[in-house]
Each structure stands twice: as C-alpha cells, then as structure tokens.
C-alpha cells in the first residue's frame, strides 16, 4: 500500500487522450515503438491535479517540464502557452472538473532506428497528455501508510538529477 493509491473510476475507460494534438479514445491512443521515450526513456514528464476546475500549481509544473527538457538538451517544440492550451483542450474534451490527475509526457520524438544518439531523430517531440479521474483512496487517507526502507538507493545529482522528472525512472523503481 502506498501514497499513489486511488479509487477506480469507470469513467476512465472512456477517457480521451491527446497525442501530438490529436484527441484519441484511450483504446486508440498509441505511441510508436521507435519513439525515443519508449526506446531509451528519453524525455520528461509532469503530473498535476485538476481540482474544482483549477490546475493546481500548473505554472510550476510547466516551468519544471521546460527546465528538465532544457537540461537534457531537448527542444519541446511548443511554447508553454501552447502546451497549456492543449492541456485545457483535452480536459474540456473529457468534460472534466474535479478529482482529475493529468500526466504530461514529452519524449524527444521518433528515431529512424534504435540508436542512442539524441540528435538522431526523425520527428518533432512526442507530446502525450493523459487525464484520468483519480480520487484519493479514502481508507488510505484515513488509516495512513507504513514506511518501508530498502537497501537500494537513488543515485545523487551527478547520476540522475532528482529535480528532473525524466522518463528514465529505473533508479526510482529499483529503489
């Protein structure tokens, strides 16, 4: 049990997702196996909540997204205003207002072949926006959680800067 638990919501089966500005039913939303995010974990992400019609701390999240992209020498290819506009468009398409978690993912884009060099890209960045209804698990909120320590630790800033929400989260998963 952890802090990321939420109550299942049947509306999520009908959620509309934005991929590069195209609105798709969740069952139709797909990203290429040649996407740098899939091949290499090459990209950045942010997640934030929609509460009573307001995107909580959205300016800070967008700023961190762009800072993370700049840190890994990735040009998002859109302005902050364009990204924010698309977030609102997908939320509006889903008629969402409250208890919503939004995941914004930006990868470096498509690669012509599985190759590590970040400059070998054949498309603009891939931008995915996934909004879902996620209300906190009331039992967990009431009962709290149990803290567990493990021997695997995350590396320091010289290994992977913890201030960047990088798609490559293996060090966090292992920890």
Regions found by a protein language model. Name each.
Residues 1-175:
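Conserved alpha/beta cores of soluble small-molecule-handling proteins
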């Amino acid at each position: 049990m952890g802090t990321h638990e939420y109550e299942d919501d049947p509306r999520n089966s009908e959620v509309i997702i934005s991929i590069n500005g195209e609105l798709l039913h969740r069952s139709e939303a797909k990203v290429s196996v040649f996407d740098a995010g899939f091949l290499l974990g090459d990209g950045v992400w942010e997640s934030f909540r929609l509460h009573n019609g307001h995107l909580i701390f959205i300016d800070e999240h967008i700023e961190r997204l762009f800072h993370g992209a700049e840190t890994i020498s990735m040009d998002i290819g859109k302005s902050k205003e364009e990204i924010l506009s698309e977030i609102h468009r997908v939320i509006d398409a889903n008629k969402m207002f409250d208890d919503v978690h939004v995941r914004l993912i930006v990868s470096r884009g498509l690669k012509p072949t599985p190759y590590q060099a970040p400059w070998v890209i054949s498309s603009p960045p891939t931008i995915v926006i996934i909004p879902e209804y996620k209300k906190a698990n009331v039992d967990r909120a009431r009962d709290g959680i149990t803290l567990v320590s493990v021997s695997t630790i995350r590396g320091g800033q010289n290994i992977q800067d913890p201030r960047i929400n990088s798609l490559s989260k293996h060090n966090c998963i292992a920890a």
